[in-house]
């Protein structure tokens, strides 16, 4: 049987090598080259030379707006009285973009939208929650990272809140529904988004990236 097998390998050596090389190439491609030209540009250059990855998103479907078209001060939808004070309830808006930098001290993420860079301000505790990385502790004592910070360069997010001057401040009311932050896992060809509001489960630690 081994002689038959050896003869078959000898006769088909070139085809076998071509098939093997093709499979190795595809495995490496899937591992290292997932995404598109725009995502590669962001990963390597930190800017888009071609179209923004989110340029074809169905903005109407997700209620996404252009930050720079919003009034510089938030619009008051209604007010309610709390003691002697009148508390405003603001109209909330959503924007989306690609994270290009962050300031841990100020709990700020710099978001490259399709119309420009926006400074997005989070509450400190909320920022810290999504800036950490989750990991799994292995039996040999080593750690396997499950998910890094949502605010690392290249990650795409949707944020909900208000414009205040030159800054977008994330906000959510109990009555508003939804979340103030979503991670964009995938952009589909029809303009739909695969969104996620929860962190990947695992132990947490400081991300270690500025």
Located regions from the model:
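Noncatalytic, beta-rich nucleic-acid-contacting surfaces in large DNA/RNA-processing enzymes
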Residues: 1-210
């Amino acid at each position: 049987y081994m002689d038959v097998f050896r003869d078959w390998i000898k006769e088909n050596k070139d085809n076998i090598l071509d098939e093997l090389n093709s499979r190795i190439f595809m495995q490496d491609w899937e591992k290292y080259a997932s995404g598109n030209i725009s995502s590669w540009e962001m990963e390597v250059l930190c800017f888009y030379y071609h179209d923004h990855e989110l340029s074809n998103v169905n903005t109407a479907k997700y209620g996404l707006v252009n930050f720079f078209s919003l009034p510089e001060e938030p619009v008051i939808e209604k007010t309610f009285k709390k003691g002697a004070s009148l508390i405003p309830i603001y109209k909330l808006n959503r924007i989306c973009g690609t994270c290009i930098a962050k300031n841990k001290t100020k709990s700020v993420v710099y978001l490259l939208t399709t119309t420009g860079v926006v400074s997005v301000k989070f509450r400190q505790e909320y920022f810290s929650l999504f800036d950490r990385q989750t990991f799994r502790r292995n039996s040999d004592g080593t750690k396997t990272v499950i998910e890094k910070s949502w605010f690392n360069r290249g990650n795409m997010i949707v944020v909900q809140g208000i414009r205040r001057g030159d800054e977008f401040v994330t906000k959510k009311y109990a009555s508003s529904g939804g979340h103030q932050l979503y991670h964009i896992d995938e952009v589909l060809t029809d303009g739909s988004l695969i969104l996620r509001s929860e962190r990947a489960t695992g132990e947490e630690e400081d991300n270690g990236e500025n």
